[in-house]
Amino acid sequence: MSIQPSITAAPARSLHFAEVLMARESITPVDAGCQSYLMYKLEKLGFVCERHTINGVKNLIAKWGGGPLHFAFSGHTDVVPPGPLEKWKSPPFSPVVSQNKLYGRGAADMKTGISAMLAATERAIASLDEREVTYWWLITSDEEGEAEWGSKWINEYLTKRNVQLDMCLVGEPSATTQTGDTIKVGRRGSLSGTITVAGKQGHVAYPKTAVNAIHKASNIVNALTHYPFEEGSDDFPGTTLQITHMDTGSFTDNIVPSAVRIEFNVRYSWQYNQGSLAELLRQIISSVDMSALVSFSRPCEAYLSKPHNNAKRCLITSVEKAIKAATGRYPVISTSGGTSDGRFYASEKTQVVEVGVPNATIHQVNEHIHLSDLLTLEDIYTDILLSLSK
């Protein structure tokens, strides 16, 4: 059944911006002109914009003002592939409003977040003091993919120019049911690994002449999955390890395998870093099989932003107040979920908070959000920006 579009006489500016961006088929790492549109709109507001193309990835860095308080908005214009088109009720790159819902790829993740901030910037920019605030837009087309040349590169670029962000608001879809019900102040880290276990091939009828690599591997798997990682706390999930794949190569049922490759992923708390976790995993593996080889890939560091004593420089406080004003309730402060680009900007000196629309349909067929969630997010973002000059 197809979606029947609704007719709206005067759509809100955030909805208009969302429809413009969602109509661009920006499947990662393609930007499809999204950043050109943003650059056009931001330059009209007085931003100085730079565009960089790094290994096929488009990055936009926009700067307004020159004050000592550095506030940044981080977002991504790329989206995941739409999947089977026949399962969509409307074309994924032809945004449709129906029954007060906005449908299309990027409706939740995260072109509406960018659109809400663009609308909020138009509303608030005249009230900001350029002598007090430096306002950054940091946008990439490489968040859904490898994330090697997007926000990671932008942060390194800013660091080389001695730019120290105080606050970074990430427009990822952080909410559960309604915009403002949940914000993210940290994320667990992620580390993937590959273990190679060697045995000796032989006939299954003569096990004494062979060494079964799977049997050896199972002991390693048992040690890893039963290791007592910390269970976490109320404000940060604990460390978990999952075996994601095992491979012996070609298979017949009368041969004892000579080698096994084990793939695993660890989601870890801020109590570890990549180096300390890798060393612990090596120790666990070598305690079972000294000859096993292990390598690591796709590291993502954990981070946790904590409240600042200085309320004027506390992004968490500003976000909570803005959400209370817009919704009448305070948000749940969470660190759940997968990795995000917030990890690239987080530091002891930079508070990172994710605030966005509900994430219930992200990466799904018929991705959508309620229009009320978009409009609420625009109000929240506007209030956050206005708080920078209070």
Swiss-Prot record:
The active site is at D78, E143 (proton acceptor). GO terms for biological process: diaminopimelate biosynthetic process; L-arginine biosynthetic process; lysine biosynthetic process via diaminopimelate. Zn(2+) 2 binds at D109, E144, H363. Zn(2+) 1 binds at H76, D109, E172. The keyword ATP-binding does not apply. It is an enzyme of class 3 (hydrolase). GO terms for molecular function: acetylornithine deacetylase activity; cobalt ion binding; succinyl-diaminopimelate desuccinylase activity; zinc ion binding. InterPro entries: Bact_exopeptidase_dim_dom (IPR036264), DapE_proteobac (IPR005941), Peptidase_M20 (IPR002933), Peptidase_M20_dimer (IPR011650), Peptidase_M20A (IPR050072). Keywords: Amino-acid biosynthesis, Cobalt, Diaminopimelate biosynthesis, Hydrolase, Lysine biosynthesis, Metal-binding, Zinc. Pathway: Amino-acid biosynthesis; L-lysine biosynthesis via DAP pathway; LL-2,6-diaminopimelate from (S)-tetrahydrodipicolinate (succinylase route): step 3/3. Binds 2 Zn(2+) or Co(2+) ions per subunit. Its cofactor is Zn(2+); Co(2+). Its EC number is 3.5.1.18. It holds the Pfam family Peptidase_M20. It catalyses: N-succinyl-(2S,6S)-2,6-diaminopimelate + H2O = (2S,6S)-2,6-diaminopimelate + succinate. CDD domains: M20_DapE_proteobac. PANTHER family: ACETYLORNITHINE DEACETYLASE, N-ACETYL-L-CITRULLINE DEACETYLASE. Homodimer. Catalyzes the hydrolysis of N-succinyl-L,L-diaminopimelic acid (SDAP), forming succinate and LL-2,6-diaminopimelate (DAP), an intermediate involved in the bacterial biosynthesis of lysine and meso-diaminopimelic acid, an essential component of bacterial cell walls. Belongs to the peptidase M20A family. DapE subfamily. This is Succinyl-diaminopimelate desuccinylase 1. It comes from Alteromonas mediterranea (strain DSM 17117 / CIP 110805 / LMG 28347 / Deep ecotype). The lineage of its organism: Bacteria, Pseudomonadati, Pseudomonadota, Gammaproteobacteria, Alteromonadales.
